[in-house]
């Protein structure tokens, strides 16, 4: 009975843990070529009651990845400023991403070490309505990417941009951090921001003001350090500080001509005036060339060998001829030198002079003995005792 009472709470806790690890699933509808922003709120993962607010000291971090893959798709990005702030999944799907994708999000509670999972089912379809062939991209240096992702600042940017564009519906196409486009991390100084690229599309043509800003003359002034050509009032200031030297306009109203598919040929340029076809090469016999290349050096080496042998064997001077060409006085002097040398060698070998006694080994000066002393010198001290 006591064992059953002990196991009941343990099984209840295990079942509760299994129930918590079950991932929630949320279905989201996306459009190709339109910006997608999904906030990762702390309240969604903490599962608090509606009337209970999220404590400001709760720290949550998120990890998102494509199901079956270690990372997110190429078009989708994740950002979170700190564990106290919510995270964001944002991006713009491409036509190749059409269909559905499953994103798994795991939230980690840095205080209680709890783990919560959520599954996002992204249904990506084609946009409805008119096309947006006129697209403009602006670099906003006064904001970070997570400051523009919420709905309120994004709508405020579109409203302010409407004063520079012709009347029409403006839609956000993409939002990209400047760090992802090669920007530098700003210094930790107040007022310094990373910057964000905002891409906007519309069905109405560009205004004269935007065309002048993106003209080559305006870019030339920016390259010289001068302000760009902005002929209208900047309605984006002071809420958004736009770098007007980094404005790009893309007009897709005129379809690009399709590249002609080259027709594969035989690879022979017959009608090219600069093409000189090679002539037919006749068959050649290289036996003669090979024999000349091998035999001529061998014959030359053989002739040189015979010439050297003749000179060394048959053209030598000889001792008799050399002695006959030498005078008698010189020959007598030479012979006397050899004779005296031999005589001195014989005298040195025949003399037997006794060696000095001091040079003999182990000679005793007091006794005159030539034999080694009876006392073993190895056992005698080097310095005798003095009395």
UniProtKB/Swiss-Prot annotation:
GO cellular component, one term: cytoplasm
Tissue: Striated muscle, both skeletal and cardiac.
Record localization: Cell membrane, Sarcolemma; Cytoplasm, Cytoskeleton
Entry-linked PANTHER family: ALPHA-/EPSILON-SARCOGLYCAN FAMILY MEMBER, ALPHA-SARCOGLYCAN
Extracellular face residues: 24-293
Membrane topology: Single-pass type I membrane protein
Family affiliation: Belongs to the sarcoglycan alpha/epsilon family.
Subunit structure: Cross-link to form 2 major subcomplexes: one consisting of SGCB, SGCD and SGCG and the other consisting of SGCB and SGCD. The association between SGCB and SGCG is particularly strong while SGCA is loosely associated with the other sarcoglycans. Interacts with the syntrophin SNTA1.
InterPro entries, sorted: Cadg, Cadherin-like_sf, Sarcoglycan_alpha/epsilon, Sarcoglycan_C, Sarcoglycan_N
GO biological process: membrane organization
Organism: Mus musculus
GO MF annotations in UniProt: calcium ion binding
Protein role: Component of the sarcoglycan complex, a subcomplex of the dystrophin-glycoprotein complex which forms a link between the F-actin cytoskeleton and the extracellular matrix.
Keywords associated with the record: Cell membrane, Cytoplasm, Cytoskeleton, Glycoprotein, Membrane, Phosphoprotein, Signal, Transmembrane, Transmembrane helix
This protein's encoding gene: Sgca
Glycosylation sites: 174, 246
Phosphoserine: residues bearing it: 377
Lineage: Eukaryota, Metazoa, Chordata, Craniata, Vertebrata
Record-given protein name: Alpha-sarcoglycan
Signal sequence range: 1-23
Cytoplasmic-side positions: 315-387
Transmembrane segments: 294-314
């Amino acid at each position: 009975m006591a064992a059953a009472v002990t196991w009941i709470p343990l099984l209840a806790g295990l079942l509760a843990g299994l129930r918590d690890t079950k991932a929630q699933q949320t279905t989201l509808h996306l459009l190709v070529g339109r910006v997608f922003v999904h906030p990762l709120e702390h309240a969604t993962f903490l599962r608090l009651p509606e009337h209970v607010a999220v404590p400001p000291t709760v720290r949550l971090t998120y990890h998102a990845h494509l199901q079956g893959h270690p990372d997110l798709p190429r078009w989708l990005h994740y950002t979170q400023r700190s564990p106290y702030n919510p995270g964001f999944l944002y991006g713009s799907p491409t036509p190749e991403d059409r269909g559905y994708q499953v994103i798994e999000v795991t939230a980690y509670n840095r205080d209680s070490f709890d783990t919560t999972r959520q599954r996002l089912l992204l249904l990506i379809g084609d946009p409805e309505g008119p096309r947006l062939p006129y697209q403009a991209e602006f670099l906003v240096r006064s904001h970070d990417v997570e400051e523009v992702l919420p709905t309120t600042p994004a709508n405020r940017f579109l409203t302010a941009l409407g004063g520079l564009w012709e009347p029409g519906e403006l839609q956000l196409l993409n939002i990209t951090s400047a760090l992802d486009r090669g920007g530098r991390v700003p210094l930790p100084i107040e007022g310094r921001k990373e910057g964000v690229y905002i891409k906007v599309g519309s069905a109405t043509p560009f205004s004269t003001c935007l065309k002048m800003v993106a003209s080559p003359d305006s870019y030339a002034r920016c390259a010289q350090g001068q302000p760009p050509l902005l002929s209208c009032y900047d309605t984006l200031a002071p809420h958004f500080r736009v770098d007007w030297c980094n404005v790009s306009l893309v007009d897709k109203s005129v379809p690009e001509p399709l590249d002609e598919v080259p027709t594969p040929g035989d690879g022979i340029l017959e009608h090219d005036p600069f093409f000189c076809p090679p002539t037919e090469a006749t068959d050649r016999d290289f036996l003669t060339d090979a024999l000349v290349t091998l035999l001529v050096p061998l014959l030359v080496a053989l002739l040189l060998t015979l010439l050297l042998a003749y000179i060394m064997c048959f053209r030598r001077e000889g001792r008799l001829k050399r002695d006959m060409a030498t005078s008698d006085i010189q020959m007598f002097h030479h012979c006397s030198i050899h004779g005296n040398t031999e005589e001195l060698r014989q005298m040195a070998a025949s003399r037997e002079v006794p060696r000095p006694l001091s040079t003999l080994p182990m000679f005793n000066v007091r006794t005159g003995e030539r034999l080694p002393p009876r006392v073993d010198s190895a056992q005698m001290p080097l310095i005798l005792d003095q009395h």
